[in-house]
Amino acid sequence: MSSMTPREIVQELDKHIIGQDSAKRAVAIALRNRWRRMQIDEGLREEVTPKNILMIGPTGVGKTEIARRLAKLADAPFIKVEATKFTEVGYVGRDVESIIRDLADMAIKLLREKEMTKVENRALDAAEERILDALLPPARSFNSDAPVEKESAARQVFRKKLREGTLDDKEIDIEIKATPVGVEIMAPPGMEEMTSQLQSMFSNMSGDRKRTKRMKVAEAMKKVKDEEAAKLVNEEEIKQRALRAVEENGIVFIDEIDKVAKRSETSSADVSREGVQRDLLPLIEGCTVSTKFGMLKTDHILFIASGAFHLAKPSDLIPELQGRLPIRVELDALSPSDFQRILTEPNASLTEQYVALMKTEGVDISFSEGAIQRIAEIAWKVNEKTENIGARRLHTVMEKLLEEVSFAAGDKIRDSFEVTAEYVDKCLGELSEDEDLSRYIL
């Protein structure tokens, strides 16, 4: 679990997301509270439940990006899901409990990867010996020491070549674990747990069967190293630790929560939508979910929900669900100055990406300050005139702007190109002014 302070978390988020300070502060405090809870006495720790968050803001202002970046910072089991993927129990589709099952799967996978990284050097040594055994079968004669010494010397030569990579393309016959046959089972809704258990049963039927396969040394080394690493980690301990991590530090981000809200102006009963909200209630409040690894309590899992709420209102969510999301954060719509900052300030900004892409063709592309300003103005103007899709509009505008440069870059006609305000107006000015054209092209 991350021990970063709220200020450090916000500073890290600032590198990738422009503005939205209140949302950043809310998630930073929520993340830090996970760490704080683990420092207090065990008796009181059980009583401290996470304060779930509801993020409200128009599309394309950074809600999902905050979740993506938070996943990397959290160093805790994290899953992002769309509320629209789920249906009420009894309807065709996935039920909400599968969120927790997926979170458990992800936590085990992450912890397994961490543990395998710890034993990587030992696994590499064992894999090296197996590859050398395949390259140099042991000597048959045991009468004298000479052949053994000779073999040992040859082994050292091959070991050196193997480490240098000169044997990577050589083909060898190596005994590896047989890949279990994948069995696809179509199950009725709500039976995902039974399906996964049946699949694991079929895959375990092959047992530890091995087969000899011919492959290149580089490929064999990777497969054998993974096999050796798997032998060195304790799978049962990983499962127990991962489940504990999910229960204590798990974070679930539910996107598009507004799409399952019943709109106030429509009077028709939308059972499936409201049903999803009702099914989410026990999950967020705290219940026990059955997974293939054992029972899992959701009492201390942090839930962050987000939605644009441009057709529905937060008050259209059922009251019980509103009560379980006590912290409300509103994200601001983007201004032209925000668009300018988005183009230049974040790590791996949009302009930086295009510069790197064009550099691969030997073209040095640059953007003048005036060009950045015009691109931002056009993106904002098109959003105002047509549908407001936030920062995503910049992708459309940039792609249209650099279409000609990108197409001709492979012809090696020029070594450098500066995008100026005049060039932006020439390419996009007419399109942005004509509402009908911008609606379909930008």
Curated annotation (Swiss-Prot):
PANTHER family: ATP-DEPENDENT CLP PROTEASE ATP-BINDING SUBUNIT CLPX-LIKE, MITOCHONDRIAL-RELATED, ATP-DEPENDENT PROTEASE ATPASE SUBUNIT HSLU. GO terms for biological process: protein unfolding; proteolysis involved in protein catabolic process. A double ring-shaped homohexamer of HslV is capped on each side by a ring-shaped HslU homohexamer. The assembly of the HslU/HslV complex is dependent on binding of ATP. It is found in: Cytoplasm. Keywords: ATP-binding, Chaperone, Cytoplasm, Nucleotide-binding, Stress response. ATP binds at residues 18, 60-65, 255, 320, 392. This is ATP-dependent protease ATPase subunit HslU. Pfam families: AAA (PF00004), AAA_2 (PF07724). The gene is hslU.
